[in-house]
Curated annotation (Swiss-Prot):
Function: One of the early assembly proteins it binds 23S rRNA. One of the proteins that surrounds the polypeptide exit tunnel on the outside of the ribosome. Forms the main docking site for trigger factor binding to the ribosome.
UniProt-recorded Gene Ontology molecular function terms: rRNA binding; structural constituent of ribosome
NCBIfam families membership: PRK05738.2-2 (NF004362)
UniProt cross-references to Gene3D superfamilies, sorted A to Z: 3.30.70.330
Family recorded in the similarity comment: Belongs to the universal ribosomal protein uL23 family.
Subunit structure: Part of the 50S ribosomal subunit. Contacts protein L29, and trigger factor when it is bound to the ribosome.
Protein name: Large ribosomal subunit protein uL23
Pfam families per the UniProt record, alphabetical: Ribosomal_L23 (PF00276)
Species per Swiss-Prot/TrEMBL record: Sulfurovum sp. (strain NBC37-1)
A single BP term in Gene Ontology: translation
Domain of life: Bacteria
């Protein structure tokens, strides 16, 4: 079962702000979140039924610091199309 704690943040980039005008928000989550799980979270905690949910996996970059390789964490992004009358201002998790 998906939980509200699996949602890390709402992304605020130039592209995501342009999509917000069309009613689409971009949500960053843990890699284990699924489309159906995200829909359940939106229904349960926000009282909103998303019209459409698209997902995208982003692999973490491999970075070097003083000769030691490290890896940034993997994440998953969701593009959530909301109904016209629904709005989510911020997500305080």
């Amino acid at each position: 079962m998906a939980d509200i704690t699996d949602i890390k943040s709402i992304m605020y980039t130039e592209k995501s702000l342009a999509l917000q005008e069309e009613g689409v928000i971009v949500v960053q989550t843990t890699p284990r979140m699924t489309k159906n799980g995200l829909k359940e979270v939106f229904k349960e905690f926000f009282g909103i039924t998303p019209l459409r949910v698209n997902s995208m996996r982003v692999n973490g970059k491999v970075k070097r610091f003083k000769g030691i390789e490290g890896k940034r964490p993997d994440l998953k992004k969701f593009y959530v199309k909301l109904p016209e009358d629904a709005k989510i201002e911020s997500l305080a998790v």
